[in-house]
Amino acid sequence: MERREFNKMLALGLAAGLSLPTLGRKSFAASENYDIPRKGNVHLMHMTDVHAQLMPIYYREPQVNIGLHTARNRAPHLVGKALLDAYGLKPGGRDAHAFTYLDYIASAQQYGKVGGFAHLSTLVQRIKANRPGALLLDGGDLWQGSATSLWTNGQDMVDASKQLGIDVMTGHWEFTLGSDRVMEILENDLDGHIDFVANNVKDYDFGDPIFASHTVKEINGVPVAIIGQAFPYTPIANPSYMVEGWTFGIQERELQDKIDEVRAAGAQVVVLLSHNGADTDIKLASRVTGLDAILGGHTHDAIPRPLEVKNAGGMTLVTNAGSNGKFLGVLDFDVRDGQIKDWSYQLLPVFADLLPPDPQMSELIEKIRAPYTSQLNEVLATSEGLLYRRGNFNGSFDQLIVDALIDELEADIALSPGFRWGTTLLPGDSITMEDLMAQVAITYPATTLTEMTGERLKFVLEDVADNIFNPDPYYQQGGDMVRVGGLQYSISPLADSGSRIDDMTLNGRSVEANKTYRVAGWAPVGQVEGEAIWDVCARWLKSQKTIELVDAAQPVIKGLSGNLGIAK
């Protein structure tokens, strides 16, 4: 069966109403030794959005992850029981804990932490032992997100990545180290070890490529092309001065040209290593041809089975492999006579209690952390409740941050970015400096205090809402809604741009368009000086000593009855 015929059969299956999401996803409990059957002769492992988490962590999946229009009630916009039902996963087990927020505290206490590079390294070695020639790909957001990554300027993650055996990577938050530092790492550390690919990053003046667009690797005699797609909106979502002179973008036409080029040069398998975000990748897969798979990241979505997206040339698999080192995707292709005959995919949760740490990686991590032990372990406070970040509108750790900003900067209102990275703490856990830095470790940490009119406040909220809920995925930037403290509002995600935010109140009184309010914030994309967010939050936490159960304030969500991306 040739590739075109294989695609036709898949299309017929779709037309017949075949429920593709539930196919091939076996309960993880049946294979807790990670001994998954091998298929074919081309093997790709995929991780993404690790955010510099070298140690095992807790990470709660979202309770609110809204999909609208064509994304409504389909992956990745399924949460809780809806996700379990869609993929045929049983409640109460390891799979349910890994992929959903359900019974999170009890399940986390039962199954323990996830991820950690020493445990991940053991899993990678096991997969490679059963899959000769397997490649390890990283989708970006690898060098940022922890205290040690910030304090070492990313060097800790570069060294750990080489030890782990990453073959190819692309980027996003890597660029917030600054273009000079990125190029220094490529030249001094990655050269000859890790291919950094990004087809969509060009020189502003002349259009020359900044990075290699792709790499071709031969796996068991099969030429495999891996094209890189860095985050398209880096100079908008992050400080543009950090990548001065570089242009980004989705660049759909240029991607199609590159696919055609590598196909003409003999590539039998072509994949896109993407940091677009899931919805953007799904649209892209429907519009370009010749891609066998998009291995995606940025939106931190743990999708148990690839979406099979039809296009004019056949079908493209679209995956997204979660975040924080919590998952490892394994994609197998059976390639014969230059054609893909079959494929299989598993998204494996990395349970630290099931994977003994790799001694060499453990030794490296201990060496990395040793100079900073006292700072990392400094106890700032104790939390009585669950502290987490992920969710479209707020998380309890973000609520803690905006509360700290209001108190410490004497503000009326506080705004905090809708970052999707940031780990979870269980009730009773100490909040250490390391835990705090896992929420705020960025290279532009200044806090700000600004006077804003009510009209300006609404504009800011509307602008961020459009980045998330724009009906066209190509205009979405993939984060969550800006977190707010002190301010209450309602949101209608299906409304037109500029008309989604309503009912803004402060202390029970309507926010007035012409009245001025003191608004605290942090992470300005312009070059602004201010006290670092971690210093502000650390001081506040020390003054509180004990953080009582945090109620993460949520807006009133209108017009989304029956949306499976919202769980009560």
Report residues per predicted region.
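Short, solvent-exposed loop/turn motifs
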Residues: 223, 386-387, 488, 510
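Feature captures C-terminal
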Residues: 32-43, 47-69, 193-199, 205, ...
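Short coil/turn linker and secondary-structure boundary residues
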Residues: 1, 115, 246, 356, ...
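Acidic, metal/ion-coordinating pockets
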Residues: 2-12, 17-351, 360, 392-404, ...
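Alpha-helix initiation and N-capping motif
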Residues: 117, 179, 358-365, 369, ...
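Hard-cation-handling environments
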Residues: 359-431
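Charged, low-complexity surface segments at secondary-structure and domain boundaries
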Residues: 346-355, 384-390, 442-449, 523-526
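Residue-level signal for pocket-adjacent positions within structured domains
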Residues: 212, 241-243, 313, 345-346, ...
